[in-house]
């Protein structure tokens, strides 16, 4: 029985590890090393009790019966023959199921019998459940998806950020905000990789104890990166809304305020969360959020920022529709607003509106929530990089110009041929740099994305 239970327990702990990696919501299972720590503590306590039994004077019936036993799960005291011994479910199984039950062994002339009923069933942990098998496979696929998503997003964001930083003609307020947004997505991807490496690189119990301070610092950094990313998405929505709603708007004047909102406000809330967590829920590595009131210190501002962005989205659509219907609007400006509407419609749904949908979702919708938050959310940076940089007409024409200059320097006698269709096809959210510069003098709100 013990030989068959050990691989089952290993499989159970593996699933527990995957569950912990996938979710950061209230009520998720404990970490694998926490379970193993409890198991080793129970073992040490049991061996101490059995040692006391051996040193003490055992009765004649007990001496001729079954000797005390630690079976790698439960502690069985010494017993007289022909008796049934009852013990409670192991604590590490209670951590997984919260179901209290009893286990039994018979003391026979040949020694201890097998444990009955099966510990996993008696304690509410059904290892052979087909639902657990499906969930295990689902979480493995989910891990692959969000790893690929964050990796591809990180690569594309680094390229996009280097492009915007390299060309001085692209340096303007809107692109400065875009670059800050790119950095926030880069930090979000890196923080996920660092968190996984720190939390799950080792399952040894001593690792959990020795790296508690560093582990908590990693979680503080992780939470800050998540909040900063949502804050810069809010800044993007606020910037678009302000440009459309206010007639005279000094972009450079408010850039410092945007930077303070994007990087400063998350630091305040994360600091409050860390202080609250230290005094009210200073357990583990701060990766399990069992206290809902503490978790709302971070969760509340994130949901509020998404709600505000959604309001901006509705109002931006209202303003755009009103401007497009105005007969006095010139044709060139109408084209600009159409491109703006297209870019806005592509951008605003990426602000995390799905987070509100699943913020109060029931437990049976957890897998769908994890899919949207981890799998699809990990590709968010990739989509934003494509929308803000690679599909931007100004960026494309600057890259084309740089390529022409390099080609003329390397091959001065070979003409450079560019199809006119390239400029027409790639003229994304904005016109060329020269055209947009000239038009921006008369239409300051034309090129926003």
Curated annotation (Swiss-Prot):
Gene behind this protein: Sctr
Record key words, sorted: Cell membrane, Disulfide bond, G-protein coupled receptor, Glycoprotein, Membrane, Phosphoprotein, Receptor, Signal, Transducer, Transmembrane, Transmembrane helix
Positions with biased composition (Polar residues): 425-442
Expression sites (tissue/organ): In the brain, expressed in the central amygdala, hippocampus, area postrema, nucleus of the tractus solitary and cerebellum.
GO biological process, one term: adenylate cyclase-activating G protein-coupled receptor signaling pathway
Glycosylated residue positions: 72, 100, 106, 128, 291
PTM annotation: Phosphorylated on Ser and Thr residues at the cytoplasmic C-terminus by G protein-coupled receptor kinases (GRKs). N-glycosylated.
Organism of provenance: Rattus norvegicus (Rat)
Membrane topology qualifier: Multi-pass membrane protein
Pfam families: 7tm_2 (PF00002), HRM (PF02793)
Extracellular side: 26-141, 196-216, 277-291, 357-367
Signal peptide: 1-25
Protein name as catalogued: Secretin receptor
């Amino acid at each position: 029985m013990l030989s068959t239970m050990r691989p089952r327990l290993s499989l159970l702990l593996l699933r527990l590890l995957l569950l912990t990696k996938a979710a950061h919501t209230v009520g998720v299972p404990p970490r694998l090393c926490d379970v193993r720590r409890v198991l080793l503590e129970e073992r040490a306590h049991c061996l101490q009790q059995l040692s006391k039994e051996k040193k003490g004077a055992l009765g004649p019936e007990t001496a001729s019966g079954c000797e005390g036993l630690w079976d790698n799960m439960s502690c069985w005291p010494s017993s007289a023959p022909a008796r049934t011994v009852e013990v409670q479910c192991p604590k590490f199984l209670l951590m997984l199921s919260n179901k209290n039950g009893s286990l039994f062994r018979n003391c026979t002339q040949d020694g201890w019998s097998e444990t009955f009923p099966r510990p996993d069933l008696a304690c509410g942990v059904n290892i052979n459940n087909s639902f657990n098998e499906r969930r295990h496979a689902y979480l493995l696929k989910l891990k692959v998806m969000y790893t690929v998503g964050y990796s591809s997003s990180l690569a594309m964001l680094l390229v996009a950020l280097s492009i915007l930083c390299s060309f001085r003609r692209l340096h303007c307020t809107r692109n400065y905000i875009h670059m800050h947004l790119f950095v926030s997505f880069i930090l979000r991807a890196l923080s996920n990789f660092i968190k996984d490496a720190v939390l799950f690189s080792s399952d040894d119990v001593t690792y959990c104890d020795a790296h508690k301070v560093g582990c908590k610092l990693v979680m503080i950094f992780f939470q800050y990166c998540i909040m900063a990313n949502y804050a810069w998405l809010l800044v993007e929505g606020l910037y678009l809304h302000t440009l459309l709603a206010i007639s005279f708007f000094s972009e450079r004047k408010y850039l410092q305020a945007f930077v303070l909102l994007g990087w400063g406000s998350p630091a305040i809330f994360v600091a409050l969360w860390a202080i609250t967590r230290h005094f009210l829920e200073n357990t583990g590595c701060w990766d399990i959020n069992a206290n809902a009131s503490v978790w709302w210190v971070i969760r509340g501002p994130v949901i509020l920022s998404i709600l505000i962005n959604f309001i901006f989205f509705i109002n931006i659509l209202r303003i755009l529709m009103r401007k497009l219907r105005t007969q006095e609007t010139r044709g060139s400006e109408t084209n600009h607003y159409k491109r703006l509407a297209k870019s806005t419609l592509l951008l605003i749904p990426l602000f995390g509106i799905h987070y509100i949908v699943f913020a109060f979702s029931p437990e049976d919708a957890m897998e769908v929530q994890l899919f949207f938050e981890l799998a699809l959310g990990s590709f968010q940076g990739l989509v934003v990089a494509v929308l803000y940089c690679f599909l931007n007409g100004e960026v494309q024409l600057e890259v084309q110009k740089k390529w022409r200059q390099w080609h003329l320097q390397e091959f001065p006698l070979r003409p450079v041929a560019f199809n006119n269709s390239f400029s027409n096809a790639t003229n994304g959210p904005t016109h060329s740099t020269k055209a947009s510069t000239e038009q921006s003098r008369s239409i300051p709100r034309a090129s926003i994305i």
